Amino acid sequence: MDSKILMSTSIIHISDLHFHTYPQNFREWKSKRILGATNLLFRRASQYPLQRAKQLVAKIQKMNWDHLVISGDLTQLSLEKGFSLARETLDPLLKDPQRVTIVPGNHDRYVRQAAGNDLYNKYFGEFFGKSEIHLRRLKDDWAIVGWDSAHPNNWLSAAGTVRRSTLQATENLLQNCPAETRFIIVNHYPLTFPEGWKFDKFHELYNLVPVRNWILRHPQIRLYLHGHIHENWLHRLPRDSGPELLLVNSASSTSKLYSEQKSSFHQIDLEDGNVRVSPILLN
């Protein structure tokens, strides 16, 4: 009889919260924020009332979970007041940094910031760390690896890049962990798209294909959690050998519901090598 005691782990995955404020002075109205603030005024602000975010926090507080993942776009315009509002609202969920993983999205690096003044790092850096990759070890031989692929772009681009140094650091980690370790990658950008989706290279990862191929070559990577495109989904990618890759999109968790929407975020339960992904609707 197998005497091994199975331990389960539950992850809450939310994304693209888009906390927003408007620029308050001329310095904040720089470059791309003009375009973003216009979009916010005429469209996004009405889609993201603060009450929805508070409702999300209250719902998660009542759920049973071991780890919280936020896969980017905490803010809309990467303004300090936006980050401050995000931190204040999410604070009830962030009491134990060891139970939280947060990676930045393109809206969190919306414009170039002065050296040493990265606002994502100021308000949420403790949930990523100062290394090239973020690492959190979970129960039962599971581990979370967070990537930072967000960087400022020109006016017409919202793309990101997974750096070679990020892939190398992850490669080194995989090689030095026990063979039975299973990994979850958290990154802002998707690797797959819904059927019929019109791909835009200026909106996705610049190096999407090589990154996706790299992940598929490493069967110990079992899950890829992301956001960016505001449609929840669970996709599956087969491998030539080894278990399939599950890709979970939880964007956008705080937006108003659209017609026939079935999911706002996901709860992911891990038990031994088994994965169960449950969609959760924020009514």
Segment roles from a protein language model:
Residues 84-172, 177, 210, 241-250, ...:
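Extended active-site neighborhood of metal-dependent phosphoesterases/phosphodiesterases
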Residues 18-21, 76-79, 106-114, 152-157, ...:
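Active-site environment of divalent metal-dependent phosphoester hydrolases
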Residues 13-15, 67-72, 99-106, 148, ...:
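Active-site neighborhood of phospho(di)ester-bond hydrolases with catalytic His/Asp-centered motifs
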Residues 11-14, 19-22, 35-38, 101, ...:
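Metal-dependent phosphoester/phosphodiester hydrolase catalytic core
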Residues 7, 270-283:
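A short C-terminal boundary segment appended to hydrolase-like catalytic domains
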Residues 1-83:
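N-terminal active-site segment of His-dependent metallophosphoesterases
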Residues 200-271:
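Conserved beta-sheet core of the metallophosphoesterase superfamily
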Residues 8, 64-65, 97, 178-182, ...:
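A general structural motif
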